[in-house]
Design a protein with these regions (language model features):
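Single conserved hydrophobic/aromatic residue that forms the stacking wall/gate
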Residues: 97-109
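Flexible "arm" and connector segments at domain edges
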Residues: 1-65, 71-96, 100
Length: 109
């Protein structure tokens, strides 16, 4: 169990902080042992659960499941940050390039 301050509402930054705490040398042994391969099933399961929430058009369930997907994405990115291979900003940069490229092409066409 981690010691993290209780709040009425947690933020994105809190999630990032908690994931870093869990993966720290003195963090959670289970979380520290995870790899992309060992976490693959959890990642896919959360994505499928989010898709089911979409099918049900249930906003509360969507919120919960999208939070789980977000946690999985950040967890896997954090593993890569630890390995020095890429950062959250690298992923964000590529995401924005993928979004903006079709828009830019449409505007100049």
């Amino acid at each position: 169990m981690i010691n993290y301050p209780e709040k009425a509402v947690y933020t994105y930054d809190d999630l990032v902080d908690i994931l870093r705490i869990l993966r720290a040398p003195d963090g959670c042994p289970w979380d520290r042992e995870q790899t992309h391969e060992s976490n693959r099933r959890n990642f896919l399961e959360e994505a499928y659960e989010a898709a089911e929430a979409f099918d049900l058009d249930d906003p509360e369930l969507m919120k919960e499941e999208l939070g789980d997907v977000l946690m999985q994405v950040l967890f896997n990115i954090h593993m890569e940050e630890e390995a020095g291979r890429f950062t959250t900003d690298d992923v964000t940069d590529l995401s924005l390039i993928h979004i903006s490229e079709p828009t830019r092409l449409a505007l100049i066409s």
